């Protein structure tokens, strides 16, 4: 049986005060490093008070690590986490590598962290999320309207959390209406060694599902999940799926996750990528990325040395690798 998750297991409120930080994930030698650089500069632009930790797999080349250190990021190497079964079960094969994100629950030198995918950009200060109630995982509800959800009964009946009132849950459905389900590109959490161990143990007895770690985290934290406003994680497809639900002036976080929307790969040729609002958000990302005034500028050589030293010390704390299956390919 799957171990039951309890609120007190993830509650860090009784721990001594520690640091806060943002954290993202990076794997491989591809171009996602550009996303992390853009995110680091975006956090500086909105004057965030907290650093960005980059949890990265061993296959990230030293050249990319140096780029991130030069942008003030704290580099922390982690070992991959592999689920017990093959990647055939996933909506996209590369999703399997995202289970490695579970390692961030072992970053116990931090009291609270905000996870952000590397294809996210912040356009407003979101430090207030650190003040969310302890003992819960906070995130933004997912939209179920894109074709990638077509394997689910939710998609077949047109149900979506953004507009649940539009579809009456059919009585003939064998299951009850779904529990709230968050997008794992952004969430607020509390690192905790007990939670970390429970996550890894639970993974060993949990069958894989199409959305990999996102499904897993929703299952694991289902009883302690609390939704936050969509302004903290605008999934780009909501622009055309639920236009009446979007006020771009108030959006603080944009998630460039639909196919063709990664700013550093953008061509405008994929479906919906020629929309004016999409083009505007792509331009805003590039404006931040290209703004040299947002590059990390240590106040003194000692500040730069401290950033490098912190990355070095953290990287020296190695994780025990898990050997559930052969190594998964790096994220594209």
From Swiss-Prot:
GO molecular function, one term: metal ion binding
Residues of the active site: 101
Catalytic activity from the UniProt record: myo-inositol + UDP-alpha-D-galactose = alpha-D-galactosyl-(1->3)-1D-myo-inositol + UDP + H(+)
GO terms for cellular component: cytoplasm
Keywords linked to the UniProt accession: Carbohydrate metabolism, Cytoplasm, Galactose metabolism, Glycosyltransferase, Manganese, Metal-binding, Transferase
Cellular location(s): Cytoplasm
Known role: Galactinol synthase involved in the biosynthesis of raffinose family oligosaccharides (RFOs) that function as osmoprotectants. May promote plant stress tolerance.
Family classification: Belongs to the glycosyltransferase 8 family. Galactosyltransferase subfamily.
Protein name: Galactinol synthase 7
Organism listed in the record: Arabidopsis thaliana
Gene (name only): GOLS7
